[in-house]
Amino acid sequence: MLRGAIFRPPRKAYGKVQLLMWKTRRINASPLMPEGLRIYAVGDVHGRADLLKQLFSRVDEDLKEYPIGETLHIFLGDYIDRGQDSAAVLDLLIERARTHRMSCLKGNHEFFLFEFLENPSVLKHWQQYGGLPTLASYGLTPITNADPKEQAELCARLWYALPKSHSQFLAGLKLFFTCGDFFFVHAGVRPGTPLSRQREEDLLWIRDEFLLHEKPFEKMIVHGHTPVMEPDVRNNRINIDTGAYATGRLTCLRLERDKIEFV
């Protein structure tokens, strides 16, 4: 008989009320990680370099207190936009990758940055998704209602301002990562379509069709993209986007064997 995987409250909870709610939660399935491996999965950062630094400190403390043979950091995308320090966030991730095993996924906001670099007219749409603070983080002066000439100039300046390390990091982002009984992705997956045949558009953008689906998927889906007030753990998915840019909460999911915890 499969026993339910335990959903443990975070060691540093957001509040007593949430902690009491989380203590009663349990998922019916029993998704497993490989023996001897611990994964730290992180939700949407959105330019909050300050919160990312704090999160790294929490993870380091956790590793010191509970050492394990192998660890993997997984970031679910949307490192940029909305918050004020997108460039600094990429610096932190690149630096962390020098000393830790990491897998960084692509989010829809990174998609917009790529689109802007290929087609400057996308700026008017990108700015609706919080793209102007990203330009500012690279020392550029954003223009709210830029005409085509100004859009092209901003695009050229961003190409020049973008460090090679950032370009390489962004070019290397993956659409998904799978490990054990878990499938990590930015937005979610389309129900009824095998995980091996998912479209990039859905992996980066899907919402209602995925969020309202209650039946099990091939694996437990760990995702971000849709902000929630607290981590949302369900029988078929775990949402760890807690709206960091607005709430000041950057969530880190800790997976080890059948344990589902937060740090």
Where in the sequence are the language-model features?
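Metal-dependent catalytic neighborhoods of phosphoester/phosphodiester hydrolases
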Residues: 79-93, 115-122, 232-233
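Short, glycine/acidic-enriched loop or turn micro-motifs at the edges of active sites
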Residues: 46-47, 81, 110-111, 189, ...
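Active-site HxH/HxHxD metal-binding segment of metal-dependent hydrolases
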Residues: 100-135
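N-terminal active-site segment of His-dependent metallophosphoesterases
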Residues: 6-90
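Catalytic-core regions built around general acid/base machinery
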Residues: 89-99, 165-172
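Active-site neighborhood of phospho(di)ester-bond hydrolases with catalytic His/Asp-centered motifs
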Residues: 42-43, 74-77, 104-107, 220-226, ...
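Acidic, His/Gly-enriched loop-helix segments that form or flank divalent-metal centers
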Residues: 118, 129-239, 243-249, 255-263
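A short acidic-Thr-Gly-centered motif at the start of a beta-strand
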Residues: 26-35, 65-66, 93-97, 175-178, ...
